[in-house]
Design a protein with these regions (language model features):
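ATP-dependent adenylation/nucleotidyltransferase module used to activate substrates
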Residues: 1-128, 134-135, 141-163, 174
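AMP-forming adenylation/ATP pyrophosphatase catalytic core
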Residues: 31, 113-120, 147-361
Length: 361
C-alpha cells in the first residue's frame, strides 16, 4: 500500500471480498536531496491511516538497499551512457514483483495485490469488470499461463510498466481496480470513507516522489556544459548543461531562440555534444524499423506476425510486423514512429493482451 488512492481502494475491495488482507508499505527511498524532499513519511502515514480504517494489519518492508542497487544505480548508469531508461519498469521487475513478492510469500501470504491499472486473465475469466468488481478466489487466481490484460481505463492503463514481470509472479498477483476507471476509483474510495480518496497522483520518479529527473540526476552525475549544434551544418547554436539530460525528439529546455522550435536528433556522449534541427521531418526523428534486445516474454514468445506495439506510456497502440531474430527482434510499424531512443522500452500486445517487450538497441 503506497499511500495513494489506488492501492487504498484495492485493499478495501479485497477486504469486502473476504480476503485476509495485510497492508504493506515498501520503504524504498527516504533520502532527502538538496532542494528535494522525499514524501515517504507522509505516504507511510496515509497508508497506515487507511489500514486502520479497514481494520487490517500493517507492515513495513524495508528495501532501500536493494532499490538503490537495482533501480537507482541502473537508471543513473543508463543516463551516463546516453540512453533513456524507465525506472518504473525496473522497479516493477526487480522490487514489486520479485523482492516484494518473495518477501510476502515467505512471510505467509498466498498472493500479493497492487493498485495497478491492469487485469489478469487466462482466456476463461478475467479479474476486473466495468459493471461490478469480480475478484476470483485464490484457487482460481493461481492459474497456469496467466495473461496480463490492459485495464478498462485506457488512459490509466499501466501494462507498459508491467511487461517485464514473469508469468509465475503474475499468477500470484491480483489487480483489484483494473476493471474501473480513475473517476470510479475515486468515487468508490470516497464512498468507503478512505482518507486518500482525493489525494493527487504521484508524478515523480517511482517511489522517490515529486522530483524532476534533471534535478535528481544532477545529484549523481557530474554536469559538464557542452555545445548544441545544428545537425546538418554543424553550426554551434548554443550551450547545454549536460548531454545526458537530453533525449531524442526533445523540444523544450534548450532556449536557442530564433523563433523556431528545435528538436534533438542525436548526441555524442564522448564529445558531450547535442545535435538539433528545426525540421520535424528529419529522418533521424523517425523510425521505419525498430530493433529490440534484452527481450522479455510474460509467457511464451510470440510467433512472427502482426501485433500492436506501445513505444511509451500512454502512447497509442500501433500495428507492427514482428520478426524474431537471433539476438532480439525487429519491429516494422505500419507508419514511421517518432522519437524512438536507445534504452527505452517497446511493449508488444496482441489486442488487449500484453505479451512482453524489449529495450531499443
Amino acid at each position: 500500500m503506497s499511500g495513494g488512492v489506488d492501492s487504498s481502494l484495492a485493499a478495501a475491495l479485497l477486504v469486502e471480498q473476504g480476503y485476509d488482507v495485510t497492508a504493506v508499505y515498501m520503504k524504498n527511498w527516504t533520502l532527502d536531496l538538496p532542494g528535494m524532499k522525499c514524501p515517504w513519511a507522509d505516504d507511510l502515514a496515509d497508508a497506515k491511516r487507511v489500514a486502520v480504517k479497514l481494520g487490517i494489519d500493517f507492515k513495513v518492508f524495508d528495501f532501500q538497499n536493494e532499490y538503490k542497487y537495482k533501480v537507482v544505480d541502473y537508471m543513473i548508469d543508463e543516463y551516463k551512457y546516453g540512453r533513456t531508461p524507465n525506472p518504473d519498469i525496473m522497479c516493477n521487475q526487480e522490487v514489486k514483483f520479485k523482492l516484494f513478492l518473495e518477501t510476502a510469500l515467505s512471510d505467509g501470504a498466498d498472493m500479493i495485490a497492487t493498485g495497478h491499472y491492469a487485469r489478469v486473465g487466462n482466456g476463461v475469466w478475467e479479474m476486473g469488470n466495468r459493471e461490478e468488481q469480480k475478484i476470483p478466489p485464490i484457487s482460481q487466481s493461481l492459474i497456469p499461463n496467466p495473461q496480463l490484460l490492459m485495464a478498462i481505463d485506457e488512459k490509466k492503463d499501466q501494462t507498459y510498466f508491467l511487461y517485464r514481470i514473469t508469468g509465475e509472479a503474475l499468477g500470484k498477483t491480483l489487480f483489484p481496480i483494473g476493471g474501473f476507471t480513475k473517476p470510479q476509483v475515486r468515487r468508490m474510495a470516497s464512498e468507503r470513507g478512505l482518507s486518500t480518496a482525493t489525494k493527487k497522483d504521484s508524478q515523480g520518479i517511482c517511489f522517490i516522489g515529486q522530483v524532476g529527473i534533471r534535478d535528481f540526476l544532477s545529484q549523481y552525475i557530474d554536469v559538464k556544459p557542452g555545445e548544441i549544434k545544428d545537425s546538418k551544418s554543424g553550426k554551434v547554436l548554443g550551450r547545454h548543461d549536460g548531454a545526458f539530460f537530453y533525449t531524442l525528439g526533445q523540444r523544450h529546455g534548450m532556449e536557442l531562440g530564433g523563433g523556431l522550435p528545435y528538436y534533438v536528433v542525436g548526441k555524442d556522449m564522448s564529445k558531450n555534444e547535442v545535435y538539433v534541427t528545426t525540421d520535424l521531418n528529419d529522418a533521424n526523428l523517425w523510425k521505419n524499423s525498430i530493433n529490440l534486445s534484452d527481450m522479455h516474454w510474460i509467457n511464451d514468445a510470440p510467433k512472427n506476425g502482426e501485433y500492436q506495439i506501445r513505444v511509451r506510456h500512454q502512447a497509442p497502440l500501433v500495428d507492427a510486423i514482428l520478426t524474431i531474430e537471433e539476438n532480439g527482434l525487429t519491429l516494422k510499424p505500419d507508419n514511421p514512429i517518432r522519437s524512438i531512443t536507445p534504452g527505452q522500452s517497446v511493449v508488444i500486445y496482441d489486442k488487449d493482451v500484453c505479451l512482453g517487450g524489449g529495450i531499443v538497441s
